């Protein structure tokens, strides 16, 4: 998958159009000028042309392109940008917080247009704005497209249970039998989670995962609608943007990210608006220093050379991270510059 940042603004303060928004924190050192907040179509075209000429990136794009940010729907050019990246892949998705005031919003109109062009909209559920903003528009989205991924970012198991119940109530209200498999999946998720909470409320992460058993996180419905839910633990992040080694729901466990790039396989590449690339799945952190070239500035040959150099650097750093975890030095940054939780 290619995860491409198309917008720096996170719409934390202004929900409909970008006037007084702040920049998504990990991008602050990179995008100081307001003019750089939105990716422009010309930049997208240049990226697309370069991706076509670099086989590893071309292969990742064919699998999936995820347009993200910040809040991707804030970009006034997002429909045109979607069309450009659609020439690379039949599977282009856009992630949104769906914190939108109404169907009259330009942001909403952009999302609708993307679904009409066969793009997919995925969301992160936010309970604080669920009833007033997300729920009414999600009803529309599930009629406009044939699938949905919902991310649940949880601070505790009780918080996760509340969010699962929100989804159960939502799909129970839909007067369509095709969503019954989704309810069956969510009911099973809820039952297993409740058992864990009742029997071991302060459980370790392994206990939580064992309680979930072999439960899949996705299901197919009659008519082809595919639903997936991702439960993602939340982390404390310092004002400097450094993430804790432990998650909020599982404070006793060092949270490890098993990076495939360390093992010589790139399954995801995150591309910033500046063109900088990192094979990092943790797009909320972006602190991995080994870079894989600049998609806008570097030649295909230079990029492929940097791929090899940075993979070796990451493998060395991951090895040191593992040793640090064994010797009570977890959290110490190594000279290779990969985050201390990446192995």
Where are these regions (language model features)?
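Canonical Radical SAM [4Fe-4S] cluster-binding loop centered on the CxxxCxxC motif
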Residues: 1-46, 280-282
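Radical SAM/AdoMet-radical enzyme domain recognition
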Residues: 41-68, 75-200
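Short, solvent-exposed loop/turn segments at secondary-structure junctions
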Residues: 9-11, 25-26, 72-73, 99-100, ...
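Short, flexible loop segments at the rims of nucleotide/cofactor-binding pockets, characterized by
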Residues: 70-71, 255
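Pocket-edge positions in alpha/beta enzyme catalytic cores
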Residues: 35-39, 70, 292
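Hydrophobic pocket-lining residues within nucleotide cofactor-binding pockets
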Residues: 5, 72, 295
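A C-terminal junction/extension of Radical SAM enzymes
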Residues: 151-283, 321-341
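Flexible mid-to-C-terminal extensions adjoining Fe-S/redox cofactors in radical SAM and related proteins
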Residues: 24, 28, 276-277, 282-343
């Amino acid at each position: 998958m290619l995860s491409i940042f198309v917008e720096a603004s996170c719409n934390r303060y202004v929900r409909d159009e970008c006037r007084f928004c702040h920049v998504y924190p990990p991008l602050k050192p990179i995008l100081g000028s307001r003019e750089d907040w939105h990716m422009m179509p010309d930049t997208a075209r240049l990226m697309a042309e370069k991706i076509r000429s670099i086989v590893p990136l071309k292969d990742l794009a064919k699998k999936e392109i995820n347009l993200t940010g910040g809040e991707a729907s804030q970009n006034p050019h997002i429909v045109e940008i979607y069309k450009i990246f659609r020439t690379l892949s039949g599977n282009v998705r856009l992630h949104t917080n769906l914190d939108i005031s109404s169907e009259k919003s330009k942001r909403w109109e952009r999302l609708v247009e993307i679904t009409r062009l066969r793009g997919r909209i995925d969301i992160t559920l936010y309970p604080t704005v669920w009833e007033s903003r997300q729920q009414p528009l999600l009803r529309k989205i599930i009629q406009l497209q044939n699938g949905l991924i919902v991310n649940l970012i949880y601070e505790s198991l009780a918080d996760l249970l509340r969010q699962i119940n929100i989804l159960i109530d939502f799909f129970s209200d839909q007067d369509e039998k095709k969503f019954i498999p989704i309810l069956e999946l969510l009911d099973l998720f809820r039952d297993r989670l409740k058992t864990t909470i009742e029997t071991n409320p302060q459980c370790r992460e392994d206990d939580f995962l064992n309680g979930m058993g072999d439960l899949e996180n996705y299901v197919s419905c009659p008519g082809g609608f595919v639903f997936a839910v991702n439960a993602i633990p939340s982390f404390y992040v310092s004002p400097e943007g450094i993430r804790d080694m432990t998650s909020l729901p599982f404070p006793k466990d060092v949270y490890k990210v098993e990076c495939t790039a360390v093992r010589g396989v790139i399954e995801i590449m995150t591309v910033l608006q500046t063109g900088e690339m990192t094979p990092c799945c943790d797009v909320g952190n972006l602190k991995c220093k080994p870079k894989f070239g600049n998609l806008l500035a570097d030649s295909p040959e230079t990029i492929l050379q940097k791929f090899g150099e940075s993979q070796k650097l990451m493998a060395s750093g991951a090895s040191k991270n593992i040793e640090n975890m064994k010797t009570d030095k977890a959290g110490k940054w190594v000279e290779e510059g990969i985050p201390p939780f990446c192995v």
